[in-house]
Amino acid sequence: MPSMRDLRRRIKSIKNTQQITKAMKMVAAAKLRRAQEMVVASRPYAKRIKDVLARAAAATTETAHPLLIKREVKATGYVLITADRGLCGGFNANLIRKATVELKEFSNPKLITVGRKGRDFFKKRGYEIVGEFTNLGESISFDAARVIAGFIMEKYLDGTFDEVYLVFSEFVNPLVQRPQTLKLLPLEAPAEESGGGEYIFEPSADAVLNTLLPKYVEVQVYRALLESKASEHGARMTAMDTATENATEMIAKLTLQLNRARQAAITKEIAEIVGGAAALEA
């Protein structure tokens, strides 16, 4: 059985750790609120640009845009969005596990990684990484998404990739994050929804389509980054909450052991005193 000194040392150490996990939980909760607001705000915009793109594609008379043309698949681009840091439960592990399984289906996969965790994992295993992006910060900017989307489109148009998949974590709530795979390129023009009135395109549907297609890719990347960031904060908040609760349970168990050890020591001392007194009387 551990000594009382060891028990006190362990209790103190766990209490210090508990303070850290509690603080990290509070920080993650504050960041999650902001990230969640950005996710909610981005979804209607992504839906609207998809609707306008569908109507422009239906009205165009021009030959297919390069981002719409399907070609023989010789190399597959795989964009994986993970976190730069850990301590967020199974967030990174779930995404990496999904990517590991899906990459086996491609004969010549080439990765673009967003976040250190995914980059480090696949670099150690010898996968070809043609682009990496880290340190995007806690608040994802559209400029950052534009840079990443521009790099993806550049590699697609120059023939490095013949198709591109985007893997990210969809935010459902702080307890639930779902890894998702989205085929990003070549784009498939969304089906036009009925209703909503007629659209008049200026200067033409072709010009609008040519402008919207790259913007659509940027919006999809931006939404994926926002969803993943909110998922990361939600997973970290949940993980730190669980760690704090586990620390509370461990402190309670160790305190009980300490009290029992203290009681045993007191009982032993009393027995020795009584025994000594009895020996003197004899």
UniProtKB/Swiss-Prot annotation:
Its main location: membrane. GO terms for biological process: proton motive force-driven plasma membrane ATP synthesis. InterPro entries: ATP_synth_F1_ATPase_gsu (IPR035968), ATP_synth_F1_gsu (IPR000131), ATP_synth_F1_gsu_CS (IPR023632). Gene3D superfamilies: 3.40.1380.10, ATP synthase, gamma subunit, helix hairpin domain. Keywords: ATP synthesis, Cell membrane, CF(1), Hydrogen ion transport, Ion transport, Membrane, Transport. It comes from the Bacteria. One of its GO terms (molecular function) is proton-transporting ATP synthase activity, rotational mechanism. GO terms for cellular component: plasma membrane; proton-transporting ATP synthase complex. The keyword NADP does not apply. It is found in: Cell membrane. The keyword Oxidoreductase does not apply. PROSITE patterns: ATPASE_GAMMA (PS00153). It is a peripheral membrane protein. Belongs to the ATPase gamma chain family. F-type ATPases have 2 components, CF(1) - the catalytic core - and CF(0) - the membrane proton channel. CF(1) has five subunits: alpha(3), beta(3), gamma(1), delta(1), epsilon(1). CF(0) has three main subunits: a, b and c. HAMAP family: ATP_synth_gamma_bact (MF_00815). Produces ATP from ADP in the presence of a proton gradient across the membrane. The gamma chain is believed to be important in regulating ATPase activity and the flow of protons through the CF(0) complex. This is ATP synthase gamma chain.
